[in-house]
Each structure stands twice: as structure tokens, then as C-alpha cells.
Amino acid sequence: MKTPTTELDNTAEGAEPASGVRPDSSPRAAVSRRYGWLSRLRSYFIFDPLIWLVTVILGIVSIPVSLLGEKGRILHGFARFWSQLIMKIICSPTTVTGLDALDTSRPLVYAVNHASALDIPVLYVYLPFQFRIAFKKALLAYPIVGWHLRRSGQICINQQNPAASIGSIRAALKSLKSGLPLVIFPEGGRTRDGQVKPFLPGAFFLAIKAQVDIVPVALVGTYELLPMDTYHIKCRPLEMRVGQPIATAGYTPRNMAELSDKVHRAVEDLHAKPVGQ
């Protein structure tokens, strides 16, 4: 049952507006109505400039520092510090559930829904261990970000055709077998409507080849915080919900789709839980 908008208070419930155009009832429209011009000013003139400033300064400082010692571990520390600053800037407290039940001393693949550019800072702050991220090749074109992805040992994967990324796959398998966890975004990109998109089966190729368990992770609230195609950051509480590991034993590249569906259902179930549960 539809609710009339404020401007149409006198319109009969469920009736067509006089203009013949129904108000936008999409998730993004609902979010936009909740956060007005004051929120936009705060975002455009405080949050966004501070985030860019922190990113540029730390990005420049990290270049010479990364030449010392093991570059992946040093740059992970920089990424974590950068993420902590961003989370303080955007004033979005995050609740984590389920992580304390995991044995994080063993290598695992974390399958995470991707709703926002700010998913990355959330993961760096609230996953309290070194990890690497599987990412799309297109990200290498971004200044500073692309350089860090190359230097920090992140994994560039073609999720549509994993065999085309054989060098990266070998490096990722080596990392997993050495005990370094991997974070993947199986949707292949950010959602445009806040819902968990279908997963690309190829995203699970590494987990199957390495025979390591997959942990479903749902980030809740990051879409409303900063959806695609906008710089308007809307402060709000967030949740990171971590599920039980899903074994890859018995799966092969031939039946990756079955594993993909199983993990997708687990992430969707976590994401759909009422807030606070």
C-alpha cells in the first residue's frame, strides 16, 4: 500500500498523483529525502575534502616508506591507518558480529557484498589481521589507488575468466597457502540498488584451488552511507555481519556455480537480518 508524499496529503491513498507521475519509491530516493541540504553541505565541504586530503598525504608518504621491509605488510598498515582516519571523519560507528567465533589463525577467503566505496575502510578497520583483496583491473587506472594496489600485493583477477589471470592466481594461491587471508567481492562491482547482486562463480576459483573455507560477510548500511554516483556521505551506524565458514571440499572448477549460489544465499541471509540481530 503506497503512502502519499507530503505534497499530496489531500490525495486519496493509493490514487495516482494529479500529475500522473508516481513519486520515486526507490531505496536511493528514500535515503535522499531523509538527508537534506545541511547533510549535503557537511559532506561536500567537510567530509569529502578531508578524505581526499588524508588520501593524498598518506599516499605520498607511503611511497618512500614502502621501499623499506616487506612492502605488502607496511602498506597494509598504511591502509589501515588511512581507514581509521576515514571512519573517524564520517562519524559512522560500526558493530561487528560473528567474527569472534572464527579461527582467524588459518587462511580463509572472505566473500563480502559490495555496496559502497567506503566498504574498503570498514574492512581494513574491523578485520584485525593482514589480508589481501582481489580487485578488478580497471582500478589500476586510478591515481594513488592503482599504485597502492600494485605495490601492496593485492590480487588482480578477471572474475569472468579466471584463467586469464594466471600470474595473479599463482601469487594468490601462494599467499593463501602461506596463511594470508583473501577478501573477494563476488558481485564483481558495487550494487546500484542496495540489494546483494548475483555472484560471479569465477570469484570462487581461488578458494577451490587452495581448498580453503569461505566466510560469508555482509556489510549493512554502507549503501545508505555512500551509494554509487554521488559524493554525498550520510553519517549512519553500520554493521559488519560475519557468518560461519563454508567448506570448499568436494567442489571443483566445474561446479563453482553451486558453491557460488551457496555463499550468495549465506551473504543474502546475513544482509536481510533486521538491524541489531
Model-based region annotation:
Residues R33-T95, W147-R151:
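A transmembrane-helix-recognition feature enriched in membrane-embedded lipid enzymes
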Residues A30, S43-I51, A79-F135:
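Conserved H-X4-D acyltransferase segment
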Residues T97, A134-K136, N158-Q159, P186, ...:
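Thr-Gly-centered strand-to-loop micro-motif
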Residues S83, Q154-N158, G189:
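Short, basic, glycine/proline-bearing loop/turn elements
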